[in-house]
């Protein structure tokens, strides 16, 4: 399954930020690369990161699914997600520590779904992408 880590596209991110408002860089990447049915995972401890929220809004407009990982309140990202996993903490470092087992659980669930013993004959239809922020 193809996956793209938006923050790791350093040359695009820095070039965009040189000429445009950097809070739109992830939204622009989702607009250009995302397809209906793809999944965007938006991670923001407060849920209020403008760059993540704008990417989520664009993803929804394109028919993508949006999963948010936030702290207790969910912030603005809560309303821009199909599913928002909220770590039950308010302090940044505690939220980030609680996000670690969530990432690993999501990865294990994907591996089991796509590559588990009962799914060895799984065939992929339309190309789908998993987006990480």
Question: Locations of the language-model features?
Answer:
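Glycine-rich phosphate-binding loops that contact phosphosugars or nucleotide phosphates
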Residues: 1-120
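Internal, active-site/partner-interface "lid" segment
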Residues: 114-133
